[in-house]
UniProtKB/Swiss-Prot annotation:
It comes from the Viruses. It comes from African swine fever virus (isolate Tick/South Africa/Pretoriuskop Pr4/1996) (ASFV). Keywords: Glycoprotein, Signal. Glycans are attached at N69, N70, N105. The keyword Lipid metabolism does not apply. InterPro entries: ASFV_fam_110. Plays a role in virus cell tropism, and may be required for efficient virus replication in macrophages. This is Protein MGF 110-7L. Pfam families: v110. Belongs to the asfivirus MGF 110 family. Residues 1-20 form the signal peptide.
Length: 137
């Protein structure tokens, strides 16, 4: 009988540990950071996609870190912003480089993208050619 009770207590304790470690990964507190955990990028980049941590940029062309090659590449310009993110309980907050703050309820998130007008999709050969000056002919 004692073995059964100890077994049940052990199962309850282990399920509680799994549940608390899961909530730590996707919930709980996240101090202000320019580099959110890799497993949370999909969340943070879905609601404010212009954050620099959402993009891998090289030679002026950026590819999504979340959706990778399955997404459209973009031209690195004013659309890509330095952002810091933080989470305190159920409040998720973005601090964008111009001291613009966007807060939302983490469990009821809303997309926010005031920089959408600056987004330029990269098209092969369209942005690779430098404009030549007269003396470079």
């Amino acid at each position: 009988m004692l073995v059964i009770i100890l077994g049940i207590i052990g199962l309850l304790a282990s399920s509680n540990l799994v549940s608390s470690s899961t909530s730590t990964r996707v919930g709980g507190h996240l101090p202000l950071t320019f580099d959110p955990p890799e497993n949370e990028l999909g969340y943070w980049c879905t609601y404010v996609e212009s954050c620099r941590f959402c993009w891998d940029c090289e030679d002026g062309i950026c590819t999504s870190r979340v959706w990778g090659n399955n997404s459209t590449s973009i031209v690195e310009n004013d659309y890509v912003k330095y952002c810091e993110v933080s989470r305190w309980g159920n409040l998720c907050r973005y601090d964008v480089e111009e001291h613009i703050y966007y807060s939302m309820n983490c469990s009821d998130p809303k997309p926010w993208n005031p920089y959408k007008i600056a987004r330029k999709e990269w098209k092969k050969n369209e942005y690779l050619r430098k404009d030549l000056k007269k003396d470079e002919f």
